[in-house]
Amino acid sequence: MHAWPAPEVPELPGHGSAVRLHDTAAQGLVPTPAAAPGEAARIYVCGITPYDATHMGHANTYLTFDLIQRAWLDAGHPVSYVQNVTDVDDPLLERAAATGRDWEALAESETALFREDMTALRILPPQHYVGAVESIPLVVDLVVKLLERGAAYDVDGDVYFSVHADPAFGAVAHLDAPEMLTTFGERGGDPGRPGKKDPLDCLLWQAEREGEPSWEPGEQARAAGLKPGRPGWHIECAAIALEHLGMGIDLQGGGSDLAFPHHEMGASEAQVVTGQRPYAHSYVHSGMVGLDGEKMSKSKGNLVLVSKLRHAGVDPMAIRLALLAHHYRTDWEWTDADLVSAVARLARWRAAVSRPDGVPADDVLDAVRARIADDLDAPGALAVIDAWVARQEAADGDDTAAASAQRNTAAPGQISRITDALLGVAL
């Protein structure tokens, strides 16, 4: 599966510093990446289930990890980035059945729209953009290994992962037992299924169901007990990450609603199947974007779609600025006022850099780098650019000798390159 075109990232003078990010597992700020200076930083971000268009919650998540990549690149780290597409799953099959569409055609069309939205928003693409369907052989291999290790078992033809196989289970999200049970049930788990050893045990391989797609696991897997079927959700990401990045990745990312059970389960499965730990050095989660008092989600239908705004003529850079105005870890409500403010900010910035010269900008790069390095403080970085723009506006029309002596022709270009390289905003 192919990703989307990569926007050019300008090189800036010098290098940024390590980025301190809030690690869900460590429950505090940690320096990232864990990779040594100059070495590649490895990041895995969970992708979409393609049964509907990209909404602001999606955009907020992928913008978060775009900023992290830009900061790592600025600090001198090449980035190895993998993202999946859950192109076979219950919500996709249910939407296809409800609309009378072929599930594969639905997944393909929504994935194509997602690529268009990411391109418009200038989100850096993954080097490996991998579908669940194409990864089924990888999943089968892991499920067989987990069975052989006694970490998985059969329930009426389905195969489940035993969470007790990983003594560190729970170390990612830090939920207590009642919270785990409730959250597991709310987010796709089946805690009440009879025959399971523990209510939290999660599905690795679902045996064939009538009217649903299934795959033949192969002779070796058949001998291990697998029947024709399809993969569970968590093991897909574990398999893809291990194949393309290996263990000990620098960062596992996604929305905060993925910390448990998805990232918890995936980490445990990877650690048990390899016998190594940690799966990831840090777990970084973006906040939820709401609308009308509820989390924006496909299932609820309370969506503000990137594509709809684009087709209405909204500049994608204004959408990007509207998202950057909120700290990545906060939960917040999308409002029309966010977009109005972002459109005005974009116009001011573009007007300021369109002038033939400008007020000094030598301190702006260090200030923006400092804000981004401090737990990805994008609102603070925007404020730095705003301050330069305000100085530029105040100097407009000041033709005194002192003012003219301070202006230089390089400043507008400096600001444009900074906003492009570190914030991804093309002026």
Swiss-Prot record:
InterPro entries: Cys-tRNA/MSH_ligase, Mycothiol_ligase_MshC, Rossmann-like_a/b/a_fold, tRNA-synt_1_cat_dom. Zn(2+) binds at C46, C237, H262. One of its GO terms (biological process) is cysteinyl-tRNA aminoacylation. Binds 1 zinc ion per subunit. A motif ('ERGGDP' region) lies at residues 186-191. Keywords: ATP-binding, Ligase, Metal-binding, Nucleotide-binding, Zinc. Its EC number is 6.3.1.13. It is an enzyme of class 6 (ligase). L-cysteinyl-5'-AMP binds at C46, G47, I48, T49, T61, N84, V85, T86, W233, G255, S256, D257, V289. Catalyzes the ATP-dependent condensation of GlcN-Ins and L-cysteine to form L-Cys-GlcN-Ins. This is L-cysteine:1D-myo-inositol 2-amino-2-deoxy-alpha-D-glucopyranoside ligase. The lineage of its organism: Bacteria, Bacillati, Actinomycetota, Actinomycetes, Catenulisporales.
